[in-house]
Regions:
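Membrane engagement elements in two modes
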Residues: 156, 203-209, 216-221, 268
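Aromatic/acidic polysaccharide-binding cleft in carbohydrate-active enzymes
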Residues: 105-198
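A structural motif corresponding to the C-terminal end of an alpha-helix
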Residues: 4, 32-37, 93-104, 150-163, ...
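C-terminal beta-strand-rich structural cap/linker in extracellular carbohydrate-active enzymes
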Residues: 255-271
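Noncatalytic carbohydrate-binding groove/subsite architecture in carbohydrate-active enzymes
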Residues: 8-12, 16-142
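Short, acidic/polar
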Residues: 1-2, 49-57, 144-154
Length: 271
């Protein structure tokens, strides 16, 4: 297999600096050599936008500048997740102020913080559940699916993000469970190979190439990510509430979304 051909970008981060030092760029390019000369070089931070804002790098040194994202830095309830998704467009819109013409990536995007960058011993950071601090039992529920759809919506609406990477592929931080099953069947009761609801979000986006700006009159109850592939338009409609919600998108017929469900609606293509 052509592993080199599958690599889009090398990201270079520091174990000791919160933002990639500018002088690392030429050193990284030299280390990668001619073999990877056609692969983009990314810098920035694998922490949060705050770090990028405090210590902005020289955008001209890198092909891509990165920051990571999680909705649960300070609070962990579902309402916080909903509100966090809606604020992501503000963060994304501010990124070009620092990166100028350099493309922006958001990676990794995780439901829980991967570690606490401000802890004395980040690897020993203790969560507020029986699970490891970087694992959320809601990864296997509608909450992760809804939040992911809305995160994609609000990041895309800013029009400034070139790349975004969500979760892991397999396991309790992924979009499906591993063949071996859960590492903690009591606190994360999934089955081997189970596809989590968030799988359906990415399946619904397969082949889509553009996201549309859309506003909900009650985004903490129901919201929609609208996408198209140039010929077909689709809406991923999420119902955050535990009651059925009737929604209407533009002049299309109304639809009732069951409690806590996500429904994918095919829409007449307008443009």
């Amino acid at each position: 297999a052509d592993v080199i051909g599958a690599i889009d970008c090398w990201y270079v981060f520091s174990e000791h600096d919160k933002v990639t030092p500018d002088d690392w760029a030429p050193r990284a390019r030299e280390a990668l050599g001619e073999r990877y000369s056609g692969v983009a070089l990314g810098g920035g931070t694998d922490l949060y936008f705050t770090e990028l804002n405090r210590e902005p790098p020289d955008p001209s040194m890198f092909d891509v500048l990165n920051f990571s994202r999680t909705p649960q830095v300070h609070a962990f309830d579902t309402r916080t997740l909903i509100q966090n998704a809606m604020t992501q467009s503000v963060v994304a819109a501010n990124a070009p102020r620092l990166t100028r013409a350099t493309p922006v990536s958001v990676s990794p995007i995780s439901l829980r913080p991967r570690f606490n960058p401000n802890a004395t011993e980040p690897d020993l950071d203790v969560g507020n559940t029986p699970l490891p601090s970087d694992v959320d039992a809601r990864q296997m529920t509608y909450v992760a699916a809804h939040w992911t759809a809305m995160s994609i919506k609000y990041l895309a609406q800013a029009g400034s993000i070139a790349h975004a990477t969500y979760f892991e592929a397999v396991g309790w931080k992924g979009i499906m469970q591993s063949a071996a099953g859960s590492l903690d069947p009591v606190n994360f009761p999934s089955t081997p190979g189970q596809r989590f609801p968030v799988w359906d979000v990415f399946a619904g986006l397969a082949g889509m190439t553009r996201a549309h700006t859309a506003q909900s009159s009650a985004p903490e109850e129901a919201d929609a990510l609208i996408v198209d592939d140039g010929g077909n338009e689709r809406a991923l409609v999420v119902n955050w509430s535990e009651e059925p919600r009737t929604v209407r998108i533009d002049d299309n017929p109304s639809a009732t979304i069951p409690p806590t469900a996500m429904v994918i609606l095919d829409l007449p293509h307008t443009n």
